[in-house]
A protein has these predicted regions:
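Canonical tetratricopeptide repeat
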Residues: 23, 57, 91, 126, ...
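Helix-start (N-cap) detector for alpha-helical repeat units in TPR-like alpha-solenoids
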Residues: 18-19, 52-53, 86-87, 121-122, ...
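Terminal, low-structured helical/coil segments at or just beyond the last alpha-helical repeat
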Residues: 4-10, 257-286
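Register position in tetratricopeptide repeats
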Residues: 30, 64-65, 98-99, 133, ...
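Residue-level recognition of tetratricopeptide repeat
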Residues: 26, 60, 94-95, 129, ...
């Protein structure tokens, strides 16, 4: 309350007009005085309730303050003032998608944004994300295709398109998309790793191992790539390589990987192997 009174005292000394409050809000926002900026925009709106920019920037400030429900409503008010404005719909959609996890509302906002800017990459991509998170993979893929129409070599659209095909139960299409993402970012850990997971599930184990090895060249500290490679080697009967990979995984995350190895039937062929048992014993929970 003391802070609020201090801000009000300073601002009330200024000419009592919409423009002065609005400009003061912009100045305070640049200084990252978000609460002071919020007060200023709200005072501006008392004089000019139908001002698009005051509602829009109020939404930005509320986002900065972590007040996401209020931010979405402020963007909605801005959109009511200027229904044909892309940004109020897009930013409102981003709040619903990323912060509030209200994916259907996010989609409705992105659709409105796209109606005003049909070829926009970002609204199409984020619409795809909302559909993917709702498990509506067909529409997610259609949205990613729209995004790729704007940016044909966009890594994220190809990668998330791969995620959608994977979760939709189409591993071959997923592999194609991850490989395309890799063409754009050859040193991307995740595209290599996701290919490995799919190839492992398809029992194409040597190919899966090759992908895990590539991912580990980029990030040697990933426990799951080491663990999954160990599983592949164990399934192929290559016990020494399986143990070596498992050792790396256990050195990074002994509790999780140790529990997985103790309960995974793929290692049943190693249960009588002294090195394997010693390895698990050394990394057993204290």
């Amino acid at each position: 309350m003391t802070y609020l009174l201090t801000v009000y005292r300073a601002l009330e000394c200024r000419p009592d007009t919409y423009r002065d409050w609005y400009d003061q809000g912009n100045i305070l926002r640049e200084r990252m005085d978000y609460l002071g900026a919020l007060i200023s925009y709200e005072k501006a709106l008392e004089y000019y309730p139908d001002d698009y920019w005051a509602w829009y920037k109020r939404g930005m400030i509320l986002e900065d303050l972590g007040m996401y429900e209020e931010a979405a409503q402020s963007y909605a008010n801005a959109a009511q003032v200027k229904d044909d404005n892309y940004w109020a719909w897009y930013d409102q959609g981003c709040v619903y998608l990323q912060e509030l996890k209200e994916y259907e509302k996010a989609i409705a906002c992105f659709q409105r944004a796209l109606s005003h800017s049909p070829g926009d990459y970002w609204a199409a991509y984020r619409q795809g994300e909302a559909y993917r998170l709702l498990k509506n993979y067909e529409r997610a893929i259609t949205s990613y295709d729209l995004a790729l129409g704007a940016r044909p070599r966009d890594y994220w659209a190809w990668y998330r398109r791969g995620d959608a095909f994977r979760d939709w139960g189409n591993p071959q299409e997923a592999l194609f998309n991850y490989r395309t993402a890799l063409d754009i970012r050859p040193q991307d850990y995740w595209s290599w790793y996701q290919q490995g997971v799919i190839l492992q599930a398809l029992q194409r184990l040597p190919e899966a191992i090759a992908c895990y090895e590539e991912s580990l060249k980029i990030d040697r500290d990933d426990r799951y790539a080491w663990y999954n490679a160990a599983c592949c080697y164990a399934a192929l009967g290559q016990q020494e390589k399986a143990i070596n990979c498992l050792r790396e995984a256990l050195d990074i995350e002994p509790d999780i990987c140790g529990e997985l190895a103790r309960n995974n039937f793929v290692f049943d062929g190693l249960r009588q192997n002294e090195t394997f048992n010693d390895l698990l014993s050394c990394h057993s929970p204290s």
